């Protein structure tokens, strides 16, 4: 029987659970004295803020939610996408967080909007049960199309993510020193969400060498001087979203940049199994390489 992961309720260790419980007390107090908006909306928002609080307790060990920063929302969005939350759930939770932040005296207008956070409306059929992974041919089709329309950079970003399993923000943060490390050590050290540091193995240096040759010392690999990272992220996401018919094989499936991590996970897991590792051993390695350190996450990626 296939194991079912409850994406809305994950286990915490005792210390983190205590932090989360204290946050919930704070949240309930705020909503108990709040009369703004409809009751059902407040009820849904309270649930959304508690989901955010659980993430904040787990990833940042935050004792209160009075000082929400952009980095917290970027990490939270990545987490929700990793867990397979629908876009409607993500946007509602973000609205809940902004509502709550205003209630505790913060200014939600200073927080990044959904566009900056990379939240793009996708198909109504989006759900955790769908296999979000790209296929080999879809990746090649995308790279070819991107090159044909003068967006070779997008093709390189997609190929690199499929080879290394990097998040889009991690791809955009790469600089020449990362590439030098890859060429010398066959690995790249990545600082991911929540400050987690991991080593990602490099098995094919072809693209790495090309990017190294084309990147000036001290510069980012994919972000040109004067460019804003969040705009590059938004642009490639929209490019993928708007050109599905040019590279996707299944017209009823919505491919996203995040789906490249699913592609990496499935292929890397298969590769490790073929080298004699057990399923559990392979999952541990893949989970670590994806930057999760939580094996049950691979259930979502291997779907």
Residue positions per predicted region:
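N-terminal core-binding DNA-recognition domain of tyrosine recombinases/integrases
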Residues: 27-127
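Conserved tyrosine-mediated DNA breakage-rejoining catalytic core shared by Y-recombinases
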Residues: 173-208
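Basic, Lys/Arg- and aromatic-enriched nucleic-acid-binding interface segment
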Residues: 136-164, 168
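Alpha-helix N-cap/helix-start motif at helix boundaries, enriched for small hydrophobics
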Residues: 97, 157-158, 169-174
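N-terminal DNA-binding module of tyrosine recombinases/phage integrases
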Residues: 1-36
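Active-site/catalytic core of tyrosine-dependent DNA strand-transfer enzymes
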Residues: 203-271
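DNA breakage-rejoining catalytic core of tyrosine-based enzymes
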Residues: 123-141, 194-206, 217-219
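C-terminal catalytic core of tyrosine-transesterase DNA break-rejoin enzymes
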Residues: 261-296
